[in-house]
Amino acid sequence: MFCTVCASAQHANYAKMSTMVRQLTLQQELIGRQGNIEGTRSKPICSNQSQELCAFVKVSKDAQRVFQEHHCKSLAQFGDIFIVSVPLRQLTKLSLEKYVDRIEARRSNGLHTDSLAYCLDAMPVYAGTSPLPQAYTGRGVVVGVQDVGFDLTHPNFFDATATNYRIQRFWDQLSVDTLKSKMYVGASYEGRAEILTYAHSRDGLIQTHGTHTLGIAAGSGYNSAYRGMGYESDICLVSNFVVGDEALVDSANRYKYTYATDALGFKYIMDYAKYNNQPCVISFSEGSRQDFHGDDVLYNAVLDSLSGPGRIIIASAGNDGQVKSYFHKPIGQVGMGTFVEGRPDNVYVTLKSASPFQIRFTSYDDTKHIHEVFTQDILRCKDSIYVDTVRLGNKQYVFSIVGYRSCYDSAELVYDVRMWSKSEIGHAVPFSFEILGAQADVEVFRMGGVWTVNQLDERLSAGECTHNIHSPASLSSVIGVGATSYRTGITNYLGEWRPYNQGVGGVRGAYSSVGPTYDGRVKPDVMAPGTNIISSYSSYYLEKNPKANDIKSDVAHFEFNGRTYAWNSNAGTSMSTPAVAGAIALWLQAKPTLTREDVMDVFAKTCTHYDTSLTYPNNWYGYGQIDVYKGLLYILGVSGVKGISSHQPTGVQFEVRADRKIEIKLKEPSCHHFSVCVYSTSGVLLERKSFDAGFSSYLLDVSSYPRGVYVIQLNSSNPFVKGSTLIRI
């Protein structure tokens, strides 16, 4: 065993740094030491000497001087927090500046499409929920989506007539059109001609995620039943960097793509909305695991600064709901543990306790081989960094453990435990870890690898599927969205039935991540349908990957302007998140000054509850499933008016004709007479009219009413006819 010691002529202040920044700084210091030894200090030590990191930097005073002296470029400011491009070689010196309080960056995200569905080779379709009211369509609201894999030419992003193009602005952070670009990375495109000429995001041949999520949030539906929520909204997009895009980025620029770069993307969308004096909601279907380092503290503060009246950010909870991610060893219990499996470099857990305890690693070949580490020994190491290379039987392991104070409670110590080997861990040779110490209360969080069971020791079976909400959905500044399920299968474009059963009736999809957050807050905030969703798919991805597995989940192919496009079925919190964003676009049309807190209040008052035995909000469903229509009634202030139903009639369609008469279309001729009441949005009854039975179409003359929004209430003994809707005339 040995404790790491980082010797350097100038030792960085690691306490100011997030994990990624600290790791990059250590690398720079090691490079510097190597240069001194080899006598090459005056020469470029390696190519990464010119690399830059996009980071959040909190500076209490004299920021301009600090950045100038350390060759940093300020990209955006939010009070005392800046997004800055920092040369890697300046990280140590920057951390030693007395006015610099924190330097924070984190690697980019993964997508939140349900990976289990791909593994099962089954991606069903869900065509949508109840019809939306005619009065609210998202008109005048900016729907922003930051994602990857955009087909900018898909007819779903025109209006319903495929005439008017709705994408107003697009920043591709991976674009190589950088010669005249004013953007930190990539390039921005504006207007119909420029965006359609660009055609697809740079990763559009290998990704199509954003084409799908954008369609859910704001697609017009183009000759289909698959219309999005805010289908008349204005669209502003950012194509960012995610895991899977590595081949598209020069290694010299790899650290320019971080959470801070994503924050610039959010700002880009919000700035567009502000410039045009429009309310804005942003959908973000990506994320990464939480931590106890506080690696997203400044990120949260920046997103909070970007939010406010008419400015709302929505993010997906993640798809780890079926993954064992947490266990708790209470005081009085001697030990608790689990078997683990994973890639050679991806077995990683985080432990949290206010008391000392013992960690036991066991490798099982012909017999048990045990290695034990006491937390007291970890804390005695320089910077509380412990590293040991140990042979257990015929297999060699490297154990790296870092101890530090929790960013949420300084009385609690946290230990990041990583296990490495030259080959996969836990497969050919079973491997377990165990927490020992009857006097310690210890919480264990999975960060990498899979927790399993093995008959070699049936005691070691700890783990529950909780505490797996991803960041930024876990942040207090963001509305986090989980996913519910309705349908269990589709027939694809080849006529094949493809089952994928995650339940029916609005039950939580088992994949949908579960709270609480690492600091104990309830998440997710809200649910929406996320299983079996049909939306647009990229023609460029289809053209490049005609045999890809996900193409088997296309439900239809069609031609538009000489290209073949698709409607595709998909599942995950990636799909539920844009549904909530699009719904909030309708709410913002009704009340453009809505805040996140206002929206949470709407959830609390109007969400539906699948499991009525639970108390809401909770860590499985949040406040429940969003009810778009009931939320609109609540926002307009008519939800409590006696005589107005809180649901729309499921057997009726409404159409406002050019002569300002409302056509009421029933699915079948009415067997009973019914009445129609017209209310103002202040709740005043304006008119009541009765209609005789025997017809399937009726006309209500509203030509004498001033232009505006009205509540139309149908009263009938037929439950499919009874209900209310909102009509704009």
Task: List the predicted regions and their residue ranges.
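Subtilisin-like serine protease catalytic core
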Residues: Q10, T129-A260, N277-V281, G308-G310, ...
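C-terminal subdomain of the subtilisin-like protease fold in secreted/lumenal serine endopeptidases
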Residues: S42-I45, L248, P279-S288, F292-D295, ...
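Autoinhibitory N-terminal propeptides
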Residues: A7-Q134, V142, D159, V243-G244, ...
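Surface-exposed, proline-anchored Ser/Thr-rich loop/turn motifs
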Residues: G640-P669, Y679-V684, R707, T725-I729
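Active-site core segment of subtilase-fold serine proteases
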Residues: F150-T211, G228-G230, N276, D365-G449, ...
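N-terminal domain-start motif of subtilase-like serine proteases
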Residues: M20, L26-S47, Q90, N109-T163, ...
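C-terminal tail/sorting-segment detector
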Residues: A9, R688, R707-I729
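Hydrolase catalytic cores
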Residues: L214, C236-V243, M270-C280, G310, ...
